[in-house]
Protein backbone atom coordinates (compact mmCIF):
# COMPACT_ATOMS: atom_id res chain seq x y z
CA UNK A 1 0.00 0.00 0.00
CA UNK A 2 1.31 3.41 -0.90
CA UNK A 3 0.36 5.64 2.01
CA UNK A 4 1.04 8.67 -0.16
CA UNK A 5 -2.07 7.84 -2.20
CA UNK A 6 -4.35 6.78 0.66
CA UNK A 7 -5.63 10.01 2.18
CA UNK A 8 -8.08 9.79 5.10
CA UNK A 9 -11.61 10.88 4.18
CA UNK A 10 -14.51 11.98 6.34
CA UNK A 11 -17.74 10.00 6.22
CA UNK A 12 -21.00 10.76 8.00
CA UNK A 13 -23.21 7.81 8.98
CA UNK A 14 -26.72 8.15 10.35
CA UNK A 15 -28.51 6.16 13.03
CA UNK A 16 -32.16 6.82 12.14
CA UNK A 17 -34.19 5.76 15.16
CA UNK A 18 -37.76 4.57 14.69
CA UNK A 19 -39.26 3.13 17.87
CA UNK A 20 -36.74 0.49 18.97
CA UNK A 21 -35.42 0.02 15.42
CA UNK A 22 -32.64 1.42 13.24
CA UNK A 23 -32.44 1.63 9.46
CA UNK A 24 -29.86 -0.63 7.79
CA UNK A 25 -29.13 -1.56 4.19
CA UNK A 26 -27.10 -4.37 2.64
CA UNK A 27 -24.02 -2.90 0.92
CA UNK A 28 -22.97 -3.40 -2.68
CA UNK A 29 -19.36 -2.25 -2.51
CA UNK A 30 -15.76 -3.38 -2.82
CA UNK A 31 -15.48 -2.67 0.91
CA UNK A 32 -17.90 -4.66 3.07
CA UNK A 33 -19.93 -6.13 0.22
CA UNK A 34 -23.17 -7.82 1.40
CA UNK A 35 -22.83 -6.51 4.97
CA UNK A 36 -25.48 -4.42 6.70
CA UNK A 37 -24.64 -0.76 7.17
CA UNK A 38 -26.12 2.62 8.03
CA UNK A 39 -27.04 5.24 5.45
CA UNK A 40 -24.31 7.82 4.96
CA UNK A 41 -21.50 9.00 2.77
CA UNK A 42 -18.71 11.47 2.16
CA UNK A 43 -18.67 14.92 3.71
CA UNK A 44 -18.56 17.51 0.94
CA UNK A 45 -16.53 20.71 1.08
CA UNK A 46 -18.22 23.34 3.26
CA UNK A 47 -20.94 21.00 4.59
CA UNK A 48 -21.82 20.63 8.25
CA UNK A 49 -22.17 17.09 9.60
CA UNK A 50 -25.93 17.62 9.86
CA UNK A 51 -26.21 18.88 6.27
CA UNK A 52 -24.26 15.87 5.05
CA UNK A 53 -26.43 13.51 7.10
CA UNK A 54 -29.67 14.97 5.70
CA UNK A 55 -28.35 14.98 2.11
CA UNK A 56 -27.00 11.42 2.20
CA UNK A 57 -30.15 9.99 3.82
CA UNK A 58 -32.32 11.73 1.20
CA UNK A 59 -30.08 10.58 -1.68
CA UNK A 60 -29.96 6.97 -0.49
CA UNK A 61 -33.40 6.41 1.07
CA UNK A 62 -35.70 9.30 0.11
CA UNK A 63 -36.30 9.95 3.82
CA UNK A 64 -36.35 13.36 5.51
CA UNK A 65 -34.70 13.47 8.94
CA UNK A 66 -34.58 15.93 11.83
CA UNK A 67 -33.39 16.31 15.43
CA UNK A 68 -29.84 15.39 14.45
CA UNK A 69 -27.26 14.92 17.20
CA UNK A 70 -23.55 14.07 17.03
CA UNK A 71 -22.96 10.74 18.80
CA UNK A 72 -19.37 9.65 18.25
CA UNK A 73 -16.43 9.62 15.86
CA UNK A 74 -14.53 6.47 14.83
CA UNK A 75 -11.29 5.87 12.95
CA UNK A 76 -11.59 3.07 10.37
CA UNK A 77 -8.67 1.81 8.30
CA UNK A 78 -9.33 -0.78 5.59
CA UNK A 79 -5.83 -2.08 4.81
CA UNK A 80 -7.04 -5.34 3.26
CA UNK A 81 -9.58 -3.77 0.88
CA UNK A 82 -8.96 -3.99 -2.90
CA UNK A 83 -8.21 -0.27 -2.66
CA UNK A 84 -6.95 0.40 0.88
CA UNK A 85 -8.81 3.28 2.49
CA UNK A 86 -9.02 5.25 5.71
CA UNK A 87 -12.22 6.87 6.97
CA UNK A 88 -12.91 9.10 9.93
CA UNK A 89 -16.61 8.34 10.46
CA UNK A 90 -18.89 10.80 12.19
CA UNK A 91 -22.00 9.13 13.67
CA UNK A 92 -25.19 11.18 13.83
CA UNK A 93 -28.49 10.19 15.48
CA UNK A 94 -31.72 11.38 13.84
CA UNK A 95 -35.44 10.70 13.61
CA UNK A 96 -37.85 10.88 10.69
CA UNK A 97 -39.71 14.12 9.97
CA UNK A 98 -42.72 11.91 9.10
CA UNK A 99 -42.64 8.66 11.13
CA UNK A 100 -44.98 6.95 8.63
CA UNK A 101 -42.52 7.47 5.74
CA UNK A 102 -40.90 4.29 4.39
CA UNK A 103 -37.40 4.08 2.91
CA UNK A 104 -36.89 3.66 -0.84
CA UNK A 105 -33.80 2.19 -2.44
CA UNK A 106 -32.65 5.27 -4.36
CA UNK A 107 -29.20 3.86 -5.24
CA UNK A 108 -29.68 0.16 -6.10
CA UNK A 109 -26.14 -0.03 -7.49
CA UNK A 110 -24.82 0.69 -3.97
CA UNK A 111 -27.41 -1.03 -1.76
CA UNK A 112 -29.68 -4.08 -2.04
CA UNK A 113 -32.41 -2.32 -0.04
CA UNK A 114 -33.28 -0.67 3.27
CA UNK A 115 -35.26 -2.01 6.20
CA UNK A 116 -35.93 -1.34 9.87
CA UNK A 117 -34.25 -3.75 12.28
CA UNK A 118 -35.03 -4.13 15.96
CA UNK A 119 -32.10 -3.05 18.13
CA UNK A 120 -32.25 -6.36 20.02
CA UNK A 121 -32.25 -8.44 16.80
CA UNK A 122 -29.86 -6.87 14.27
CA UNK A 123 -29.05 -8.74 11.04
CA UNK A 124 -25.69 -10.33 10.31
CA UNK A 125 -23.14 -9.71 9.04
CA UNK A 126 -22.80 -6.07 10.07
CA UNK A 127 -20.34 -3.79 8.29
CA UNK A 128 -17.02 -4.08 10.16
CA UNK A 129 -16.94 -0.50 11.61
CA UNK A 130 -20.50 -0.94 12.89
CA UNK A 131 -19.72 -4.36 14.39
CA UNK A 132 -16.66 -2.85 16.11
CA UNK A 133 -18.70 0.08 17.46
CA UNK A 134 -21.48 -2.14 18.82
CA UNK A 135 -18.90 -4.53 20.29
CA UNK A 136 -17.59 -1.66 22.41
CA UNK A 137 -21.02 -1.38 24.09
CA UNK A 138 -22.17 1.61 22.03
CA UNK A 139 -25.96 2.11 21.95
CA UNK A 140 -27.35 4.85 19.66
CA UNK A 141 -30.54 5.06 21.72
CA UNK A 142 -28.78 5.98 24.97
CA UNK A 143 -25.40 7.42 23.89
CA UNK A 144 -25.20 11.17 24.36
CA UNK A 145 -28.43 11.43 26.33
CA UNK A 146 -31.84 12.41 25.02
CA UNK A 147 -32.74 15.20 22.64
From Swiss-Prot:
Mg(2+) binds at residues 56, 60. This is Nudix hydrolase 1. Pfam families: NUDIX. Disruption phenotype: Increased level of 8-oxo-G in genomic DNA. Magnesium may be the real cofactor in vivo. A motif (Nudix box) lies at residues 41-62. Induction: Not induced by paraquat, salinity, high light and drought. It is found in: Cytoplasm. Belongs to the Nudix hydrolase family. Residues 7-140 form the Nudix hydrolase domain. The lineage of its organism: Eukaryota, Viridiplantae, Streptophyta, Embryophyta, Tracheophyta. Homodimer.
